[in-house]
UniProtKB/Swiss-Prot annotation:
Keywords: Host nucleus, Transcription, Transcription regulation. It comes from Autographa californica nuclear polyhedrosis virus (AcMNPV). InterPro entries: Baculo_p47. This is DNA-directed RNA polymerase subunit p47. Interacts with LEF-4, LEF-8, and LEF-9. One of its GO terms (cellular component) is host cell nucleus. Component of the viral DNA-dependent RNA polymerase which is composed of four equimolar subunits of LEF-4, LEF-8, LEF-9, and p47. Plays an essential role in late and very late gene expression. One of its GO terms (biological process) is DNA-templated viral transcription. It holds the Pfam family Baculo_p47.
Length: 401
């Protein structure tokens, strides 16, 4: 185990034994059969009886870093104690707290590999500076309006989730092949793997209807659809679901009317259609909304039914689809100044710029000319923070000439 806990109470001893406190700790560890050479964190309590004799109550944590292989072996408090024990002489109180914060972040994420590397790292100055910038940036984002925060949440996969920012390499494995016996549809699904890709208004050349068939009617239903000359696409991984590929000159409503008898008798169930633009043009909001949500959710999560754990994804998808509807097919209700091709939600550089500002916010002003302030007309100090509560500190201890 990484952490070994020991509670030990001595017998009553003469007052002079208080000078031998460390020896008593080592003896307690040795007496209980543990390695007294390991780093240890000791909480001690001294009890004095009526005769003036003292008794020591030790609560000892011993750390064996070589055996730290699993998060379940420790707690965040243990990590804090280990950092206090090993870094107390090399870091200031502020830096110590920042290091504890980043280690706690890795502990809560279950990232034991990175946590081990951080705890082993000899020089953590650069890491502490990075954590400070992260904290500054998060405070900066807390002052965004709700609309700004929502747009960033949509366009950034890991907003405000510890240290996993967008500029770090994304190690997430791509979504596996869904099992459809149609390479074109599989490629379509692979083109939408994140919320930020949903906003690009994917319009595909082919149109599909996805149906779920009752297990007891599967063979008869497939045979009946084939007799009607429907182009059927089966799935090798998910049973009792199929795709119908539509003709280029038809829409899904034409096909659904043909399937009305099967739908009414609950032999088949509609999962989604991909030609949602048809319902947008015809003013059918509910069908446009329902099918958009179902299709995008399937692209992102490989699930046909919404699950409670994905409430945030559902909310973000609803926001995107509803904005498109109420803005006439566009996410933004205005034209972007720099380009009419992109909408504001697609500007990923906004986040990069805020990180650059965060890295440069700690600026030392050497003379009055650098302040660049007109004392007569008044002018804002250019700190680059866009943060109303931030102030410029003047060192009054230095003599002014």
């Amino acid at each position: 185990m990484f952490v070994t806990r020991l509670e030990h109470t001595t017998q009553f001893l003469p007052q002079a034994c208080k000078l031998e406190d460390e020896v008593l700790v080592l003896y307690a560890i040795y007496l209980n059969g543990f390695d007294y050479t390991l780093p240890r964190f000791v909480k001690r309590e001294v009890q004095v009886n009526a005769d003036g004799f003292v008794r020591f109550d030790y609560n000892i944590k011993m750390f064996d870093f070589a055996r730290f292989t699993d998060m379940t072996q420790t707690t965040p408090e243990d990590i804090d104690d280990y950092i206090n024990l090993t870094r107390i002489n090399s870091l200031s109180d502020h830096d110590l707290k920042m290091l504890q914060l980043v280690c706690r972040d890795r502990w809560y994420k279950g990232d034991v590999a990175r946590l081990r590397r951080i705890l082993q790292q000899k020089d953590v100055d650069d890491l502490v500076k990075f954590v400070c910038n992260v904290m500054w940036e998060r405070a900066y984002e807390d002052h965004y309006t709700l609309g700004q925060q929502l747009s960033i949440r949509i366009t950034t996969k890991l907003i405000q989730s510890g240290l996993d920012f967008k500029h770090q390499p994304d190690t997430t494995a791509p979504v596996s092949v869904r099992g459809w016996e149609d390479a074109t549809f599989e490629k379509y699904l692979q083109s939408i793997t994140s919320i930020s890709e949903v906003i690009k208004r994917h319009v595909f050349s082919k149109k599909y209807i996805c149906l779920e068939v009752a297990a007891s009617y599967w063979s008869d239903a497939v045979e009946s659809l084939q007799q009607e000359n429907f182009r059927i696409i089966l799935n090798s991984k998910t049973p009792y679901v199929l795709l119908i590929e539509m003709d280029d000159d038809k829409n899904s409503m034409v096909y659904l009317r043909k399937l009305a008898h099967l739908l009414e008798n609950k032999i088949v169930n509609l999962l989604f259609v991909t030609d949602v633009e048809f319902y947008f043009k015809n003013g059918n909001f509910m069908f446009y909304l329902y099918n958009s949500l179902k299709f995008y959710y399937y692209c992102l999560k490989n699930k046909f039914a919404f699950e409670n754990v994905d409430k945030e994804i559902f909310f973000l998808l609803y926001t995107i689809v509803a904005l498109e509807w109420f803005n006439g097919g566009h996410l933004n209700s205005f034209t972007l100044e720099k380009s009419a091709l992109y909408n504001p939600l697609e500007l990923s550089t906004r986040r990069l710029n805020s990180i650059k500002r965060a890295a440069q916010h700690n600026r030392v002003i050497n003379c009055d000319s650098e302040i660049n302030m007109d004392y007569i007309r008044g002018k804002r100090v250019r700190t680059g923070a866009h943060y109303g509560k931030r102030v410029v500190n003047f060192d009054l201890n230095q003599s002014l000439h």
